[in-house]
Amino acid sequence: MKHESIIVVYDSCQALAEEIADLLGAESISVQSMNNRYVENGQSFVLAVEYQTDGHLTPHWQYAFQTFCRTDLSGKKFALFVALGNIPDHDTGMELCDELRKGGAHIVGDLPNAVYPSWKLDNWVCSISPNL
C-alpha cells in the first residue's frame, strides 16, 4: 500500500527513486510532473536532486524549486540527496535547504551524494523514514 502523503521526486534517476519509494511505501513522480497540486497535497518529499557538470541544478530541478518556493511549505517535510552530478560545495546544497525552510519546510535529511561509495541507500532511508 502506498503512503500517498510521501512523494519521491526524480529526474533521470527513476530506478533509484522507485527503489526509495518502495522502501517507504511512497509514490514516485518525475520532477517534470511536479506542480502546485503535488506540493499542496503532499506532506513529505524525498528529492533526488540532480546537478549539471557546471554545478548548477538541472533546468527541471530549477523549475521545481521555483514551484516549491512559491507554495506554503508549513508543516511539510523534505529529505534531499544528490542523485546525479556533483554539488560544487556543501554551501550550495544548503542554500536549497535554506530556501525550503524559508517557506516553512522541515528538513529531515540533507544532501548526501548517492554516487559516493560510502552512501548506502538502505541506511539513508532508515535514517529519514521515522521523520517523514
Predicted regions and their residues:
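FMN-binding flavodoxin-like domain, especially the glycine-rich phosphate-binding loop
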Residues: 2-29, 34, 39-132
